[in-house]
Structures are given as structure tokens and as C-alpha cells.
Amino acid sequence: MAQILPIRFQEHLQLQNLGINPANIGFSTLTMESDKFICIREKVGEQAQVVIIDMNDPSNPIRRPISADSAIMNPASKVIALKAGKTLQIFNIEMKSKMKAHTMTDDVTFWKWISLNTVALVTDNAVYHWSMEGESQPVKMFDRHSSLAGCQIINYRTDAKQKWLLLTGISAQQNRVVGAMQLYSVDRKVSQPIEGHAASFAQFKMEGNAEESTLFCFAVRGQAGGKLHIIEVGTPPTGNQPFPKKAVDVFFPPEAQNDFPVAMQISEKHDVVFLITKYGYIHLYDLETGTCIYMNRISGETIFVTAPHEATAGIIGVNRKGQVLSVCVEEENIIPYITNVLQNPDLALRMAVRNNLAGAEELFARKFNALFAQGNYSEAAKVAANAPKGILRTPDTIRRFQSVPAQPGQTSPLLQYFGILLDQGQLNKYESLELCRPVLQQGRKQLLEKWLKEDKLECSEELGDLVKSVDPTLALSVYLRANVPNKVIQCFAETGQVQKIVLYAKKVGYTPDWIFLLRNVMRISPDQGQQFAQMLVQDEEPLADITQIVDVFMEYNLIQQCTAFLLDALKNNRPSEGPLQTRLLEMNLMHAPQVADAILGNQMFTHYDRAHIAQLCEKAGLLQRALEHFTDLYDIKRAVVHTHLLNPEWLVNYFGSLSVEDSLECLRAMLSANIRQNLQIWVQVASKYHEQLSTQSLIELFESFKSFEGLFYFLGSIVNFSQDPDVHFKYIQAACKTGQIKEVERICRESNCYDPERVKNFLKEAKLTDQLPLIIVCDRFDFVHDLVLYLYRNSLQKYIEIYVQKVNPSRLPVVIGGLLDVDCSEDVIKNLILVVRGQFSTDELVAEVEKRNRLKLLLPWLEARIHEGCEEPATHNALAKIYIDSNNNPERFLRENPYYDSRVVGKYCEKRDPHLACVAYERGQCDLELINVCNENSLFKSLSRYLVRRKDPELWGSVLLESNPYRRPLIDQVVQTALSETQDPEEVSVTVKAFMTADLPNELIELLEKIVLDNSVFSEHRNLQNLLILTAIKADRTRVMEYINRLDNYDAPDIANIAISNELFEEAFAIFRKFDVNTSAVQVLIEHIGNLDRAYEFAERCNEPAVWSQLAKAQLQKGMVKEAIDSYIKADDPSSYMEVVQAANTSGNWEELVKYLQMARKKARESYVETELIFALAKTNRLAELEEFINGPNNAHIQQVGDRCYDEKMYDAAKLLYNNVSNFGRLASTLVHLGEYQAAVDGARKANSTRTWKEVCFACVDGKEFRLAQMCGLHIVVHADELEELINYYQDRGYFEELITMLEAALGLERAHMGMFTELAILYSKFKPQKMREHLELFWSRVNIPKVLRAAEQAHLWAELVFLYDKYEEYDNAIITMMNHPTDAWKEGQFKDIITKVANVELYYKAIQFYLEFKPLLLNDLLMVLSPRLAHTRAVNYFSKVKQLPLVKPYLRSVQNHNNKSVNESLNNLFITEEDYQALRTSIDAYDNFDNISLAQRLEKHELIEFRRIAAYLFKGNNRWKQSVELCKKDSLYKDAMQYASESKDTELAEELLQWFLQEEKRECFGACLFTCYDLLRPDVVLETAWRHNIMDFAMPYFIQVMKEYLTKVDKLDASESLRKEEEQATETQPIVYGQPQLMLTAGPSVAVPPQAPFGYGYTAPPYGQPQPGFGYSM
């Protein structure tokens, strides 16, 4: 039996299977902060990636393109911390957002999450904690101790409260790995250096201590051996006993001399220390005692990272092969292991108690029994209470304590036991009962309540029953905790807490008999019963049938409570609740009509029987409700006429629910019944629904009853809103007939809907006493003329006066016109005008009179109004017209009168006198009218004076338009007359601007010359001089130079710039020269005229530095570098030194540049100037001056100049410069170009730069200095990034031997890396294939196998390719290669070893084909190896197809135990072919999975009898008995025939065989067959057959046996019958006892049958002479 293990070991996944490159599985690239995530940094092609593996979904790794030096996942969430250089960032992957970032001043060499929100950062000097919460920066915790200097930091740990911090590092010393730790106390701020390799903190609570102790565990492998230390850090908490220090040896096997601890985790659940070593060993130690529990090797590779495994309270880690492994305590096995294997029962007991582990039951029972036997009951009680899994907390233990009598004055052992259990936790069900029974008997109920509150008792139904007799409320609490629903609900009902019943029942999913409960509650309290009933139906699905609940209410005649219940229960108004709604309304209509009225009024229900309820409402006197429910018109008309019993407002609304026809019928019925009583309601209904009922129908209905009063009130209610003209007309008619004249006036005044003509004619015909309505209609609709005629002809002149005085005085002009038309006297008209003073339009009155040529009629009235001080324009207009027509000094009136309208009067004068029109228009500033009059009458002088005085730019713009045909004469008058007369500058300014705006430059010049040059008051005006020159620039450039020379008071710089912009460069030059602006003048010569010779002459004449500078700049731009430099020197201007240097560089004027830069250096000690001066000296080959300059004080960038000299191949100068700045790298490059190779190598050694080594190396290769090249190359190849370029350089030049020599020499370097081994292997494959195999066998683990694979394949090195595929675990490719190139690559042992590891099973069949073709004699060996994974059916089909089955017979025999049909049939065919009948019979008996019938049919025709015998055997096996027997008879196999007939159990077949024996005269066979088929043969048939054939002697033994059996049966039957009779007699005398259990007989009594001889196949043949079973009845 295998030994039990105390640990459970599990491999969770293989990182390489997830596509992780093995090279990236290491301490520097893989991190695991917890068992949730693994984070790996990879480089795929040129892209850096971070792979995050979620351990809950490892098959879907997350890949992110992130370039970082390190990445660590948060222990719990998808938050990642990234480090790139000194920059730290924290990202939330799910939110895709950056949480925090910080840049450190020092490099972070190690970092780790120490909690869910804190990262520890370790630099070379200190340790920091960085919280990801808020905006906090990293906080320094402590400085690193000197003992950790030079160590590789491998871990950082803290205790639970982060009060103790531990930094761990390792270093190589004296050929061993030494561990160094720094333990730091946050509170004391002190550090202690400790030698150790792995450590962890733990919280441990010792027995008897109140608080947990903080333990520090660390392991060390020193020169003397390994030790595990467990100590308590800090001062023990108050009241705690200090934890005793532990120091135990850590065993390391002899073969692991260099092994040391690398990781430690402590299981908080089991208090076990997990220690892992470098060589993959795991050690388990008990935390409390330090005892070693278990040690074994779990990994052949180093486990370099670990974390706690929360799911199992164990440890999880990753080794270098990429296996993710976990180890945890096997709870079922650890205690038995400690007990049986370690033989440490004390530790087993201690761990079992401490961690509640099973496996120590026997130890605890033994200890308990021993203490109990000694009378040490208190200790026994402790053992029983502390035993894990409650193994001793049994009723038997309680009975044992109960059996012990209590000592006087002492607590009984039972109570001691219960006391210990209560201190530790909760009692179980039996313990709770046994404790509470005596407590309740003593009346100490408060103890029970206390224990229940503290959850010390396990509640049960039995405990509740026990408590209920004392306190039902307390019992309720027990029942609730015990979850006994029926008892809980019973207690709720008994204690009156019915509101909790439903809630509790729903909560626990219990369904009691709700109706029974309701009856009980209703009997006790109807109010509580109502409340309970409402709770039953408050959900969507009622708990009980509402009808049954209502029946319960009605049983107790609780109408009010039932109503309240139903109102609440039926509030959702469901269709299915219709009968209940009817029942609710019915009971209230019969017993409380007011309640029913309120319910109906709230419109809560809609699904009750409306017809039935309507009848009940009418009987109850609720006519309104009855009408709401009536649907028949007869019923409605019967009720609706009683309007005095109905609410009028409701009745009006009710009509809205009736159809139009029904409404009209009801209205007719109301008027017919009592028109006086019902008229008001009728009118209200008609008013509200006139749109639906049609106003015309209602009007006709009123008129049919001759009710004009009703019609008036009805139409009065709608006329204000109606747009129907007929309604308004009918309303006017009704108002007239009812004498409502004021209403007629109002509607005539306010309505806009009636037909005015129709109403006017009606009012004329009506002959009303008051004509005001008619006046209003005529006034509103402009029938004034008709009105005047009607009133004048009917002698109603007083209404004319009333009209113009009171109704509408503004209509006076129309009335006057009408009166003039009827030849009314002038006196009457004048009097009427005087009566209506100022309340009408004078213009209209003048127009009416003027139309009739009676204007003079108004002269006295007009003069009187002016005399009164009237300022109305119309009055003055009329008077002006009269004065103009009468020629009564009109011009004076027009100039002096300020009140008339200039446009009106001017228009009146245009044809009569244009001059007067101009006067009128000018007075009113009527510009357009004035212009038109002047243009039409050629009054241009007047117009020009008016325009100048007007000073309106817009007006000027309108007359100066090119489209104006009168523009030229107007301009002539402006220049000659208007401007000459003016002295106002503003008038001149506006006029000039107008000409400018109109774009009339020539006219403007003419105008300005008149003003400026003709010695006017405006001659020296600066703006006008500027304008004159600018206009000339624009219009006539020939005059510009003249104006420049004649005028002096203009803005020279602005004018000059404008001249330049208009390409008048000479004029601009003249202006600048005239005003001595020389810099601008020379600029014009340079930039615009472009004549540098004139500029040079001008500069010599001026001799100003600024002018020389401008000239120099221009010369420089034109490429005249030498002249430019001379000009800059004359200007003494070094400001443009950069442009000068650039130009000199381009043109090569180095000598001149030296002069310029020497001048510039005197003016400014610029670094650029001195740098360029050095380069210029180098270019002019003044090396002595250069060396003197650079050795003296200077600010030049010598390195930069050296690089330029180097680039331009001035290597001598570059040598001086690089030497000066000690740039050995560039010096070495320079020396290479000078051919000084040895000196170049020395310089490269001083520079120690990869780039320099590479450059010198390449130069040495080109110079064939291979020894020096190799010296350089050895410094390059250790850098993996540079290796490829170096190899390509050698290869491109064909120096393969030298390259291989260099790489072979480099393999021994300390910094030799994978790329070197890989590239050397590739070179071997190309140039020295004979050395390839040896190299791979030595260094296969250090080469990049995929890369070498490609090289080996390209070089056709098939054996080496197979070797690499095998090492790279690409077994499929290895097999394919061996099969494709068997001559070079195939080796039998290697092939069979690899083929079993392939992933693609298809290769098995290709391998079989390969062996069949190349190695047929070894095929069976291969098949034996492949058989575990081979599909045998497919293999057999293949061999059958190629007809090679005999070749693989050994394979077929070896796999036949699988009972495969194809294998069986193939082997059987081989046996038949080989005529091996014995092997065939053995195969058939052992393996039955083949086509039996097909094989039998094939064999029955075989020429060998043994094979035909097997055919009969097969027919027998398939129940083809007759065919089998016939075949035996044919081949004279008599024994087989008798045996098969016997086995068939077929009587007919056996008798046929007997007959055949007799026919063939085989009497001996007949006798043998009688006994062989004894059970099948019928004695009568045998007797008859023997008698007929006279062979009674052969049959006699058979008959003797038959007689013997039958006599035995009869004797047994007789004995059985006698026994039965005796039992019957005994039964008759026995009294009937009802208490005895009754038997259920499954069948009646039957005749006993003696036992028969056994038959095969579970079937018993009936005895001869007994009835055979029929189809359900006995025959």
C-alpha cells in the first residue's frame, strides 16, 4: 500500500503551453504578486509586450504592447504597476486609465506589492512605500544597511500591521550564496542586520494568551549547515506570555551541497511553515514547535517566485521550466501521517486541536477514557470539548458525566463540561437540551435568554417545546432559530403577532392552511382578522382564495370589515375579480347605500355586473348612479326627467356620455315633461354640447317649443365663442324679440362673425326705437354713406349729430361728404364742423372737400384754427395750398411757416412754381425730391450750394454716381462756385471725401489743385497735400515728382512707402533723400531699384555704419561674399556672424572669414565665433595657429570642430582636436584612418565604448589586422545587440575562419551569452558541419534552438536537426525529419523514444508506413511502442489494404486483449489461412467481438473437419441449434451433436436427433443420447420409440432412472401433504389476535411441486404430466 502523504501537490499550468518563450521565464522577467495573476515581459519581434495570465482563466492570456523594465500586478485587482527607467506608473487595465505616476531620483532595483494598495520600492540606498490612493508620493521608510551592499534583492516582507519590515538579498561569497537580511522596526526606527536567505512574518495565538503574537521566521544556510529560527519580535502584548524561541536544523541532502532556502510562506490556517530551496525541495515545519513535518523534492528546476495560495492555504510558485506548482496541507492525511509515520502523538493532538483537523480520533478517545478513569473529570471535560470535529461531543459523553455524582461544595462534572463548551462556542442539539432542562426546572430562564443572545445553543423543535411551557415568546425565538415553521406560525398566532405570520411564511417558504388560520384569528379579534386577511392578498398572487376569505367575514356578519378588506384586495381592478366587485357593491347597496355611493363615486371598479347594480341603485334612490349604469334609452329617459333629484353639474356631464340621438331624445323629453323646471338644465346641456349635437338642431328644438327666452340664453352662452354667422344673427333676433336692446348693441359692436348686410337690413326693417345698433353696424362696416342717406331721408338728423359727436367723430369727413352730396346747406355743414372740434382727420376733411372743389369753404375755419395756435401740419398744408392758388405771398409763408409738411406742399408746387418747390424741399431737407426738381429744371448751381451746405456723404454718393447724367454740370458748379464760396473746413472735407468715395481721381485732382495750389486758405493743409500726392500716385503718376518737389508739408515716410508699394521707387528715393533718411534711401536702392553700384556710391558718400551694414547684408545675399565681408568690416558690425560663416563655408572664402572672425572675436567672445575660427584655421591648414589657439583660453566647442574635421577627412587637425578634449573613441577612429592601428586599439581601450570597438574592429578587418580585430571583437560579441552586425561584417568579406576563431575564443568569456553560442552553431552548420554535433551536445541548453533549427535545416544537417527538435520538445518535427531523411537521421532507439511523445497521432500511421517501406523487420517493435495510443481498427484496415497482416501477427496477438473487432477478425483470418484450428478455437473462446455468423458460414464449407466443427460450435453459440446439430450429424460428430441438443433445451430437436440415430442404426448413440438429453426427452415418446424399434434394452437404464425420480417425488409430496394438514388443524384451534402483524399474500395456495433437476440458463422445465402455462389461464 502506498504511503499516505501529508501534502497535496498540483501542477496548475505550463506557461510554455500558453506560448510563453522559455527565455522569458525568469526572476527578472516574470512576477507573481499573488495567486491571482502571473505577469511576464516578452519581446515578440521588435515589439515589447506584457503578458498577464489570470489564474482563474489561464487559457486566455492578456497581451498588451508595453515597453517597461518591470511590471507587477496588484495582488487582487487588474491594476498593473510599470517601471521604465526611473519613471513609475500605475494603470487600471479594466478602466484603461492611468491612476498614478512618479519619477524617482534613484533607480529602483526591486519593487513589490506589500498590500492591496501599497507598493514597496527598493533603491540602492533606501526603501520607500508608495500608496496608490490619493496624490501621495513615495514615503521613505528606512535606509539600506551596509551589509546589503552589492546584494541582489530577492524579497521584501512586512508583518500584518506593517510595523516590522524585512529586506532580503543574496550575494556570492567564497563559492557559496550568502543571504543578508535587514529587519527594521517602524516604531523604534532601528535596523538589525541578520544572515538569512528566506523569511516571513506570522500572527500566532498561543494557548492561554489573549492576543496574537507577531512571529518572525527565517531560514539560513551557513557554512555549518541550515537553520530555521522562529522568534517573537517586539514586546509581547500586555497579558501575553512571550513566545519561546525556536531554532531547528534544516536538512539538506548530501547531493545538494550548494542548496539553500529561496522562499518561505506561512499558512495562517494551519500554522505551518512552507520552506522551498533552490534545488526544488519543500520542507514543512510546525510553527508552534518548529518540528519538521515533511520534506521532499517537488521540482527538478529552481522555483524562483512564490506566493500564498489562498484557496488551499498553501504555497504556489513558478519554476524555470514554466510549471506553475502548488503545495498545501492534506487535511485528511496530515494527522495520521504525524501519528503513524512521525510517531509524534503530542504534535498530532496539538495540531488537531489547534486547527480542528481529523485523524486523531483514537488518540483523543484514549486520552479521554484514561482521564475519566482516573477521576480527573475537569481535564477529561477539556479533552472532550477540544477534540476536533466534535468527535467526543456525543450523547454517550453526556451520559457518562451525568452518571458521576457531584461532590459536596463542588460543581458537578456535567456542569464543568457544559461550562467549557459554552466558553469555547456553541452547544449542539443534544447538549442544548440536556443543559436547558435542569436550568428551566430551577426557574433560571434569564440564563437561557443570555445563552440565546450569545448564540451558545443549537436551537431545535424539541428545545422549543421544552421552553414553550415556560415562556411562549422565548419559545418563539427558539423555533425561529431552529426553523420550525409550523410551530413559529402557531406561536405568532397565540401571541397576537399576526402581522408577522405572512412575512415569515414567505421568508422560509412554508405554506400553512391560511383559511383555517384566518378563522382562528377572526374568532379572537375581528380587527386583527381583517389585518391578517389583507396581508394574505397584498401580493400579486394571493396566498388564499379571496372568495373563501369573504365567506369567513360573512360567517361573522362583518360587513364593514369585509368592505374594508375588499376595497384593499380589489384595488388592482382585475377582470377576474368581477364577481367579487359585484358582491361588494351588492352588500353595501343593501346595507349601507352611502358607502356604495362613495365606492361608485371613486370609480375603483369596472368589472362588476353593471345592469344588476343599476337596478339596485335605482331601488336605493341613487338615481345618479343608476343613470351611470343604465344603457337602455327607456330607462335613461325615465330617470333623467327628475332633474330636481339630480346634481345639475353631474347631469350636464352625463349627457356627454350619450350618443347624439339619445341626447336629443332626452332633451326633448325634459322639455315635454316640465319646460319651466328643466329649462335651465336644458340650456346648460345645450351650451356645453352644442358642437356635438349641432347648433342648428338645438335652435330648431327651441323654436319648435317657441321658447325665444331659452334660445336667447342658449345662444348667449355660445355666441362669444362661436364663429357661425347664423348663430350671431339668431342671437340678435332673439335679443330684439326679448327686448334686450343693450345686448343687441353689444353684439353689434363686438362681434366679427355676423353678416353685416343681413343685420343692417334686419335692423332697418325692425324699426327699433333706438337707432344706435344700426349706427354701430354701419360705422363698423363702412356703411356710413348709406346711414347718412337713411337718417337724412327719414328725418333722423339728430342721430347724425349723435353719430359724429358720440359714436365716431372721426367719421365727420365722410359725413360732410355725404351731406355735400345731398346738397345740404353750407351753414348746417359749417355748424356741424364747429360742433365736432379736433376729433377727426383734417387731411381727410380737406380731401373730401377738395374732391368736390369746395376747399375755400374751409378758409375761415382754417384761419381760426391757426389763430388758436394749432400746429397740426394738415391745417397748415391746406392753408398753404390756398395761399399758393391765390398767390397770396406764398414764398414768405413757405420760408417762415415751420408747421407745414414740406413734401406735401413741395409736391403741390412742382408743376406750379419749381422755385417754390425748391424752397419747400430745402426747408424740409427733402433731398431726393430737391435733386429731382433741380435736375428736371437745370438748377445745378442751387443744387451744388445745397449739397455743400448739406454735408451728407450718402447724398453726395447718390449724385456722383456714374449713371447720373447730370454729374458733369453739377461737378463744374461745385468746383467753380460752391467750394470757392465756402470757408467751412468741414464742408470742404466732406466734399473731398465724397469725390474720393465716388472714385473720381481726375476730378478730385482738379478740385484739390483749386484748393491747395491756388493760394487759398487751405494751401498749407497737411492732409490735403497728402491727398493730392496720393491721388496723383493713383491717377496721374507724371505729376507725382512735381508735387513732391513743390510741396513741403506732407508726411514723407508714409508717402514714400506708398510710392514704393506703387512701384514709384525713384520718387520714394527722392523723398527719403530730401528728408535725409539715408538708411531707407539705400534700402530703396538695394531692394527695389536693385542697383548695388549706386548703393555702394551712396554708402561712400554718406559713410554711415548703418548704411554699410545694409549694403553688406545685400552683398551677402547676392553671393558677393568677399565684398560683403569688406563692407561688414567697414561697418564694424559682427552681428551677422552666423550668416557670414555660412556664406564663407559655401563659397570657400576661408582667408577672408579668418579676418572677419578675428574682428568679431574682439567685439564678442561668442562660443560660435571661436568654434568657427578654429575650423577656418583648420581649413586654411594653419595647424600651428590652431594648436596655439586651442591650448589657450577659449569658449570653442572643440569636440564639434573635431567631428567636422573628421567628417571632411582633415584627420591631422581632428587628431589635434580629439587629443585636446581626450575623446579617445573618436581619436581611435581618426588614428584608424591615418593607418595607426595599434594606437587606434589603445585609444579604443581607453574609450571602452562599444561603438568605438566596433569601428576599430571593422577598420582592422578591412586592413587585415585580424589579431587586432579579434582583440576588439571580443569586446563586441558580449553585447547581444551588436553581435549580428559584427558577424555580417566578417561574412560579407569572406573571413569565415577568423570569425569562427574569434567566437570560439569568446565562449570562455564571463559575459558569454546565448547569442554567441547560437551564432557559432550557425557558422558551424555553414562552414564546419563536422563540429556542429559536438558543439550542440555541449551547449544545446545555451543556444537559441529555433534559430539553430533553421540553420541546420538549410545546411541539410538532418541528424543535428533531429537532436535539436528533441531538445526543443518539437517531437512531431523530429519524427518527420527522421522519416524524410532516414539515411542520415534515423536511429531506432531514438525514433522509438521520440515517437511516443508526439502530439499529432497521425504521425503514428506515417511512421508505420515508413517502417513498412524501410524497416519492415522492425515493424512489430514499433507497433508495440505505439499500441497505447494507436487506433487498432485503423491500423488493421491499413495492413489489410497493403496485404501485410501476416507481417504484424505478433502485434495483433499483443493487442487482442482489447477485444477489438477488426483485430479479432484479422487474427481469425490468419489462423484460418495457416490452418491453425487450435489457435482459432482459443481466440474465439477468449474474444467474442467479431461477426460470429459470417465466420461460421465461412467455416462450414472448410475442407478440414476441425474447422467445420468450430463452425458448429459458433452456430451453437448464436442459438442456431438446429444448424449446429445438422452440421455435426453431417461430419459424424455424434458427441457434439448430443451435447448441443442438450444445451438447446429444445425437446423437439432432441427427439429428432434420437430418430436420426435410429435411422442410421446408431443404437449405442441412441442410448448415450437418452442420458445426455435426459431433461428434454418425454418418457412416453422414448418408450414408444424403443418399443417400435425393438431396442428396449438400450432404453431400460433411462426408464429405471425415470421411475426412481418419480417415486421420490411422490414420497415427498405425500410427506408435504401430511405436514400441511397438521398445520391447518393447528391454525383452526389458534385464537385470533388482532395485535399481530398480518401477512400480505401475493398468491393463493397451490399444490406443492417437488424440486426439479436444475436446467441451464435460469429456466426450470415443468415436470412431466403437469399442465403447461398458457396465455393467462390454465388449460
Curated annotation (Swiss-Prot):
Stretches the record annotates as WD40-like repeat 5: 196-257
**Stretches the record annotates as WD40-like repeat 6:** 258-301
Q: Which GO terms describe its cellular component?
A: clathrin coat; clathrin coat of coated pit; clathrin coat of trans-Golgi network vesicle; clathrin complex; clathrin-coated endocytic vesicle; clathrin-coated endocytic vesicle membrane; clathrin-coated pit; clathrin-coated vesicle
Instruction: Check the record and name the Pfam families matching this protein.
Output: Clathrin, Clathrin-link, Clathrin_H_link, Clathrin_propel
The alphabetized list of GO BP terms reads: amyloid-beta clearance by transcytosis; autophagy; clathrin coat assembly; clathrin coat disassembly; clathrin-dependent endocytosis; Golgi organization; intracellular protein transport; mitotic cell cycle
Region (Globular terminal domain) spans which residues? Answer: 2-479
Q: Which InterPro entries does the protein's record reference?
A: ARM-type_fold (IPR016024), CHCR (IPR055358), Clathrin_H-chain/VPS_repeat (IPR000547), Clathrin_H-chain_linker_core (IPR015348), Clathrin_H-chain_N (IPR016025), Clathrin_H-chain_propeller_rpt (IPR022365), Clathrin_heavy_chain (IPR016341), TPR-like_helical_dom_sf (IPR011990)
Question: Region Trimerization: which residues?
Answer: 1550-1675
Q: Which segments carry the region annotation WD40-like repeat 2? A: 68-107
Q: Where is this region: Involved in binding clathrin light chain?
A: 1213-1522
Region named WD40-like repeat 3: 108-149
Compartments annotated for it: namely: Cytoplasmic vesicle membrane; Membrane, Coated pit; Melanosome; Cytoplasm, Cytoskeleton, Spindle
Cite the residue spans of the region called Binding site for the uncoating ATPase, involved in lattice disassembly. Answer: 449-465
Stretch list, region Distal segment: 524-634
Query: Cross-referenced SMART domains, in alphabetical order?
Result: CLH
At what positions is N6-acetyllysine found?
Answer: K856, K1441, K1501
Can you name this protein? Clathrin heavy chain 1
Q: Which gene encodes it?
A: Cltc
